[in-house]
From Swiss-Prot:
Highest rank taxon of the organism: Bacteria
An example Gene Ontology biological process: heme biosynthetic process
Alphabetical list of Pfam families matching this protein: Ferrochelatase
InterPro entries: Ferrochelatase (IPR001015), Ferrochelatase_AS (IPR019772), Ferrochelatase_C (IPR033644), Ferrochelatase_N (IPR033659)
Disulfide bonds listed in the record: none
Gene: hemH
Main location: cytoplasm
Entry protein name: Ferrochelatase
Role played: Catalyzes the ferrous insertion into protoporphyrin IX.
Catalysed reactions listed for this entry: heme b + 2 H(+) = protoporphyrin IX + Fe(2+)
Organism of derivation: Brucella anthropi (strain ATCC 49188 / DSM 6882 / CCUG 24695 / JCM 21032 / LMG 3331 / NBRC 15819 / NCTC 12168 / Alc 37) (Ochrobactrum anthropi)
Alphabetical UniProt keywords: Cytoplasm, Heme biosynthesis, Iron, Lyase, Metal-binding, Porphyrin biosynthesis
HAMAP family xrefs: Ferrochelatase
Gene Ontology CC terms: cytoplasm
Record CDD domains: Ferrochelatase_C, Ferrochelatase_N
Length: 350
């Protein structure tokens, strides 16, 4: 090889090294609803104030809503909600199950994506800590030039997915440098999600000493007026249920869909979970199992509202056997859903 050939070869090697060194870091941000830091009055009030002040959650005019919120709700509800949270509190970690599971989901996803050396995984809450803004800052400080943000809601609603998007972009609005962004969309019909739900139901039913006459899919409700204005949430929930029912091979008498957690005087999406549970028991149904397809992790609304309150209502009205089917949480099937959707959005960036 001549000296001229060596000189010509060297720049191409340098260029390749430089290109490899400049592979941008990509952040993956998992976001769930949120949780109070404790069950006492102070932490509960701070959490509820942030949550119930969100215009996406309560659409009433502020002149009407704020006097109710600050004059009544925040003086009475923190104590009552604190007692409910205390029933499900993770004593070992001194936190709610939602925070425990969301952290575990983040850690397991990071391990699963270890084959991508330029990917950084973190997690945040829309309300409470760690906040979306603080974790976004952390990702940027670590050199992330691109971020995949994943609102952990299978079905889209302005009250959940949209407000997470709002807060994320609000954080970016303050930045001089803004990373490229991808948002993981709702996944109410994704085969990997439907299969994970079906497998979780089948595995749970195998552990029971009874065969439920009814499997009830209970989704968090929203005011009917929101749906009437175009929120696609109800349709997406029912589509999830349709696919899940078909996968399980259950008929309409064996599988029902309902909506829970209504708040305030407005009409919410129906049928209501509590009324349906009571009605089924009074009409002779002796055994049932309830799952929450719209929640990726167990929380107050699943563990207590269904596992305790709905169970009591069913048994008090003539039912004999009741079981709550846990959410996917950080199970193998649940993590497969999250990993599959994140890997799809990472294409072209890793």
């Amino acid at each position: 090889m001549s000296e001229m050939d060596k000189v010509q070869e060297k720049p191409s090697q340098t260029t390749k090294t430089e290109v490899q060194a400049k592979l941008p870091k990509v952040g993956v941000l998992l976001v769930n609803l949120g949780t109070p830091d404790g069950t006492s009055y102070g932490p509960m009030r701070r959490y509820l104030a942030e949550f119930l002040s969100d215009r996406r959650v309560i659409e009433w005019p502020r002149l009407i809503w704020y006097p109710i919120l600050y004059g009544i709700v925040l003086n009475t509800r923190p104590k009552r909600s604190g007692k409910l949270y205390d029933r499900i509190w993770n004593r070992e970690k001194n936190e709610s199950p939602l925070r425990t599971y969301t952290r575990a989901q983040g850690e397991k996803l990071a391990t699963a994506l270890a084959d991508y050396p330029n990917v950084v995984v973190d997690w945040a809450m829309r309300y409470g800590q760690p906040s979306i803004e603080s974790v976004t800052d952390r990702l940027l400080q670590q050199g992330c030039e691109r971020i995949v943000m994943f609102p952990l809601y299978p079905q889209y609603s302005a009250t959940t997915t949209a407000t997470v998007n709002d807060k994320f972009f609000e954080a970016l609005m303050k930045k001089r440098f803004q990373p490229a962004v991808r948002i993981v969309p709702s996944y109410e019909t994704e085969p990997v999600y439907i299969e994970a739900l079906a497998r979780s139901i089948e595995k749970h039913l195998e552990t029971l000493s009874f065969k439920p006459e009814v499997v009830l899919a209970s989704y968090h409700g929203i005011p009917k007026s929101y749906s009437d204005k175009g929120d696609p949430y109800r349709q997406q929930c029912l589509e999830t249920s349709r696919l899940l029912q078909a996968r399980l091979g259950l008929d309409d008498s064996q599988f029902r869909s309902t909506f829970q957690s209504r708040f305030g005087p407005e009409e919410w999406l129906q049928p209501y979970t509590d009324e349906t549970v009571e009605e089924l028991a009074k009409h002779g149904v002796k055994s049932m199992a309830v799952l929450n397809p719209g929640f990726v992790a167990d929380c107050l609304e699943t563990v207590d509202e269904i596992g305790n309150e709905a169970a009591e209502e069913f048994l008090e009205n003539g039912g004999e056997s009741f079981s709550h089917i846990p959410c996917l949480n950080d199970s193998e099937d649940g993590m497969k859903v999250i990993e599959t959707l994140v890997r799809r959005e990472l294409q072209g960036w890793v």
